[in-house]
């Protein structure tokens, strides 16, 4: 009976985390469309529900009732597994995201490493989908995605090292508490900018949406997908975008900490501050999508390997030297 209670409690915790994440994905899709429409001086979704808030629900119902077509020449098992892998990896990453000192599903001591490892695995779902489709456009999109994500993961990893040098811990709550007096966005602002741009590339967002460039590759690795399988790729993509916004808020914006430690700001729950910071970063994501044209593939690779990687490595040396010289290193 005790085991059943433990299983029930853990299942409840998982659902309590995943359901809000999935609802948030639906809401940010609506927000993404509204921001894009605002920049282009049009209304965007405004028919289904008040202010068009139920548009994502209508889209979900449409995908549920659409036929799932599996190409006859595809590798059917891998073709079906690909969107499942993509969505699952995007959702399990949220297990270690803290919304306060206690509001976290798994408060592990290697939270940053876990996040980096799981988010890096996301490319496998895209590669599987592109290869299993047995079609040239999905395959080209998958190759592009693999090269792009691997390139920018290196920069993100080096940026995380900058933060870890200042904290001395891989625990996400420790990283947040280390910013109690000063958010890391101030001393590490160049790293925040590189992290933000790398996160755009990591999540295949414009101007780095080359794996699904409509003018060149139809829909890239998603070309042969339809119905709920296509929707699962879509859910995984937006869950990853939210995850990168959460990572940015934890690493640079103090996570669930109040920006001003004064009344009445310190009365607001930490989870609310965390949500506000995630939304702020997502609005920046959406504005970039609306105003910046797509990069060429060679420009994307050059930016990652010739500019971001050397700059982030240089900043690691500068950060370590500064902390060592002033005896501020958090480790003995």
From Swiss-Prot:
It is a multi-pass membrane protein. Keywords: Cell inner membrane, Cell membrane, Membrane, NAD, Quinone, Translocase, Transmembrane, Transmembrane helix, Ubiquinone. InterPro entries: NADH_UbQ_OxRdtase_su1/FPO (IPR001694), NADH_UbQ_OxRdtase_su1_CS (IPR018086). Its EC number is 7.1.1.-. It catalyses: a quinone + NADH + 5 H(+)(in) = a quinol + NAD(+) + 4 H(+)(out). Its main location: membrane. GO terms for molecular function: NADH dehydrogenase activity; oxidoreductase activity, acting on NAD(P)H, quinone or similar compound as acceptor; quinone binding. Belongs to the complex I subunit 1 family. HAMAP family: NDH1_NuoH. NDH-1 is composed of 14 different subunits. Subunits NuoA, H, J, K, L, M, N constitute the membrane sector of the complex. This is NADH-quinone oxidoreductase subunit H. The gene is nuoH.
